[in-house]
Amino acid sequence: MKRLRHCLIALALFCSSAQADELMIVRSAQNFEEAMSTLQAAIAAQGYKVTKVQRVDIGLEAKGYKTDRYRVVFYGKPGEVEALAAQYPDLVPYLPLSVAIFAEEGNTILATSRPGLLKQFYPAPALKPVFERWEKDLGAIFDMVRETK
């Protein structure tokens, strides 16, 4: 299980163009259930709504891999995702925002790409403050998860 997790992380890092500064990663001392609950509460505290929780571990297990808990939490501000999708259809692949959360040896890890990086690909002046707010809010969400014991 640990080996599979390390392989998946290595694959994601080596196969994508993502560099370390393009990712936001936080480790929580909470068990998976507590960290998931804290993550959802932190998302709500920033004014967002969880729209979907996708179980990744089921797909991996169906392929024969033994894995611990692994989810992707999708979230967005009510109305904002729809408005942005309507005005900027090419932004749809990045909506709603998401955070991967998985268990690892008694800890829980959260990871996502930095929303502020979207400014490089979507230079519309109206989007810059949106991307910056998303990144600031995500930092607050991750801080809450990291600091909650």
What are these regions (language model features)?
Residues 1-6:
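Positively charged n-region of N-terminal signal peptides that target proteins for export
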Residues 7-16:
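Bacterial N-terminal signal peptides
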Residues 20-51, 143-147:
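Terminal, regulation- and interaction-focused segments at domain boundaries
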Residues 35, 39, 52, 56, ...:
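Stable alpha-helical elements in mature extracytoplasmic
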Residues 44, 48, 53-97, 101:
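Compact, glycine-rich, soluble single-domain proteins
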Residues 98-123:
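Beta-strand/loop substructures that line and gate deep hydrophobic ligand-binding cavities in soluble
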Residues 115-149:
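C-terminal partner/receptor-binding element of secreted or periplasmic proteins
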